[in-house]
Regions:
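Residues forming the ATP-binding cleft of Hanks-type serine/threonine protein kinase domains
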Residues: 80
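Basic, Lys/Arg-enriched alpha-helical interface segments
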Residues: 1-58, 69-75, 84-87
């Protein structure tokens, strides 16, 4: 299976920099990198009402991303604490 191209929006990159816990940050980065080879990993869920948006969890944090299968692109659009990320 060919890999997907992975892009991270600048706003999502800023949100990643806010994560203070270094172990959580490293696990978030690891999970984001894995999206390039497996865009819909076990535990990912499609967001209700959004045909192309998915989320993965890492502790209390969520990564919201879109998948374009035709262009083979995964675009990380938002990263944040679960209480804030869906707003």
């Amino acid at each position: 299976m060919a890999a997907y191209s992975l892009t991270i929006k600048p706003s999502a990159m800023k949100e990643l920099q806010v994560v203070l816990d270094k172990s959580t940050l490293s696990r978030l980065i690891e999970k984001i990198q894995l999206l390039a080879t497996q865009p819909r990993p076990s535990g990912s869920e499609q967001l209700a009402g959004r045909s192309n948006l998915y989320r993965i969890r890492q502790g209390s944090y969520r990564v919201i991303y879109s998948v374009d299968d035709q262009l083979r692109v995964v675009d990380v659009v938002k990263v944040g604490h679960r209480r804030d990320v869906y707003r």
